[in-house]
């Protein structure tokens, strides 16, 4: 078993050793605290079938917990919408917020293992930034992650992945993610 006190995730070590220096050189930061870093990664699964069967939210939360390595929180409806047959406080999905070492581990697994397993994968879109240095992407299948057993999946559920950075602009955030080998198309 690995000694937990001396273990540093691969991307966290890469950030400390090479990414910070490359970002400082590229953008000309005067202070080390100006250099953008990863803040958090939020994984979200919306379960549309939860209106008919609330047990599907529980299985989605279990799968998301396996993928993230930490317990998923069930999200509830804020208010009732009669057209969608949604009632207030009805479970609709689940989410996980990753920070610290788990965040770097997940990003490493996403880039090196999960994204290459996506069918017809050419790269991720480079225009999915929000204007404040955060990147959002979606996956249509949860079994691109090795933690999910393909045979035990009842229903194919997609997920949203939001990568939040401390970057002020989209260009800085894109450069940061490129340093982590995020495979952008454009």
From Swiss-Prot:
Annotated TM spans: none
GO molecular function per UniProt: rRNA binding; structural constituent of ribosome; tRNA binding
PROSITE patterns in the record: RIBOSOMAL_L5
Gene3D superfamilies given in the database record: 3.30.1440.10
Top-level taxon: Bacteria
GO cellular component: ribonucleoprotein complex; ribosome
InterPro entries tied to this protein: Ribosomal_uL5, Ribosomal_uL5_bac-type, Ribosomal_uL5_C, Ribosomal_uL5_CS, Ribosomal_uL5_dom_sf, Ribosomal_uL5_N
Keywords: Ribonucleoprotein, Ribosomal protein, RNA-binding, rRNA-binding, tRNA-binding
GO biological process: translation
Pfam family, one: Ribosomal_L5
Family membership noted in the UniProt record: Belongs to the universal ribosomal protein uL5 family.
Subunit structure: Part of the 50S ribosomal subunit; part of the 5S rRNA/L5/L18/L25 subcomplex. Contacts the 5S rRNA and the P site tRNA. Forms a bridge to the 30S subunit in the 70S ribosome.
Its biological purpose: This is one of the proteins that bind and probably mediate the attachment of the 5S RNA into the large ribosomal subunit, where it forms part of the central protuberance. In the 70S ribosome it contacts protein S13 of the 30S subunit (bridge B1b), connecting the 2 subunits; this bridge is implicated in subunit movement. Contacts the P site tRNA; the 5S rRNA and some of its associated proteins might help stabilize positioning of ribosome-bound tRNAs.
Name of the protein described by the UniProt record: Large ribosomal subunit protein uL5
Species of provenance: Cereibacter sphaeroides (strain ATCC 17023 / DSM 158 / JCM 6121 / CCUG 31486 / LMG 2827 / NBRC 12203 / NCIMB 8253 / ATH 2.4.1.) (Rhodobacter sphaeroides)
Gene expressing this chain: rplE
């Amino acid at each position: 078993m690995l000694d937990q006190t001396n273990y540093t995730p691969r991307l966290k070590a890469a950030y400390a050793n090479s990414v910070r220096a490359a970002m400082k050189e590229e953008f000309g930061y005067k202070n080390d605290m100006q250099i953008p870093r990863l803040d958090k990664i939020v994984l979200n699964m919306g379960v549309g079938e939860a209106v008919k069967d609330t047990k599907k939210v529980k299985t989605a939360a279990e799968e998301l917990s396996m993928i993230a390595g930490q317990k998923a929180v069930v999200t509830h409806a804020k208010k009732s919408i009669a057209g969608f047959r949604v009632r207030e406080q009805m479970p609709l999905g689940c989410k996980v917020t990753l920070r610290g070492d788990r965040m770097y581990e997940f990003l490493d697994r996403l880039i090196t293992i999960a994204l290459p397993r996506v069918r017809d994968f050419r790269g991720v879109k480079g225009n999915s930034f929000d204007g404040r240095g955060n990147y959002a992407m979606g996956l249509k299948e949860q079994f691109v992650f090795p933690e999910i057993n393909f045979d035990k999946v009842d229903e194919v559920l997609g997920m949203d992945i939001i990568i939040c950075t401390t970057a002020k602009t989209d260009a800085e955030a894109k450069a940061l993610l490129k340093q982590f080998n995020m495979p952008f198309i454009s």
